[in-house]
Regions:
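Bacterial N-terminal signal peptides
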Residues: 14-24
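Terminal export signals
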Residues: 9, 13-14, 47, 51
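Sec/Tat signal peptide C-region and signal peptidase I cleavage site
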Residues: 26-30
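Extracellular beta-strand/beta-solenoid scaffold signature
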Residues: 37-38, 42-53, 72-84, 104-120, ...
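N-terminal secretory signal peptides that target proteins for export/translocation
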Residues: 1-9
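Right-handed parallel beta-helix
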Residues: 33-35, 62-72, 88-106, 124-136, ...
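The right-handed parallel beta-helix/beta-solenoid scaffold, focusing on the short coil/turn
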Residues: 48, 55-57, 65, 79, ...
Length: 209
């Protein structure tokens, strides 16, 4: 793909809908992307749903390439990523222009938190250069739901250079992000037009750095 974003700043926000749409157009490369093979990403690819229990998974994305988690519909929490038992999930660019997109993922059913990512039991998330667009949770956390059980003294949820756009929590709190009993680090992130039953973003027992 030839679309590159180095820094996701507010001045780029109006351009994002058309940029994301181009990824999913009929003639787009995204329509014929191969599935991701391994976690050292050298070419843009479509990722499958990730379910981690007590293990570590590190993704590295080469310059100008994309990892895309899209169109996943599940009847359990975590539309694209599910973490438990202190699992560790990292997606970072190798340099500056590797990108990740979580788009149009949704969950329903009895357990329906975290439209894109669900993390519990002190699992950790570290992501940078990422767009969360139009993910939907039936409960809490339209894009991300993160819950811990004790203070580890480190950031359990670290999100850098991200855009949260048009995410929805249909019957809960945190249109973009719901966090409880975890430490959070947010840097250079943009939140726009996320919707929830009571609030755009909600936290309880959280420390912001």
């Amino acid at each position: 793909m030839n679309m590159r974003i180095i820094f996701l700043r507010k001045e780029y926000l109006s351009l994002l809908p058309s940029m994301i749409a181009s990824l999913f157009s009929v003639n787009s490369v995204a329509e014929v992307l191969d599935s991701c093979q391994g976690y050292d990403i050298k070419a843009s690819c479509q990722a499958s749903r990730q379910s981690l229990s007590g293990i570590t998974q590190d993704w590295s994305i080469a310059d100008g390439q994309w990892v895309i988690f899209s169109g996943m519909a599940n009847n359990a929490s975590g539309g694209a990523v599910f973490l438990q038992q202190s699992a560790e999930f990292t997606i970072l660019p190798q340099n500056e222009t590797g990108m990740t997109l979580f788009a149009n993922n949704s969950i329903s059913g009895e357990y329906n938190n975290g439209g894109a990512i669900f993390a519990k039991e002190n699992s950790t998330i570290n992501i940078a250069n990422v767009i969360f667009d139009s993910n939907v949770a039936g409960g809490y956390g339209g894009a991300i739901y993160s819950a811990g059980t004790n203070d580890t003294g480190a950031a359990d949820l670290r999100i850098t250079n991200a855009v949260f756009l048009n995410n929805i929590a249909n019957d809960g709190k945190g249109g973009a992000l719901y966090n409880i009993n975890n430490d959070v680090y947010l840097s250079d992130d943009v939140f726009n037009n996320n919707q929830a039953y009571t609030s755009t973003s909600y936290s309880d027992g959280v420390r912001y750095h």
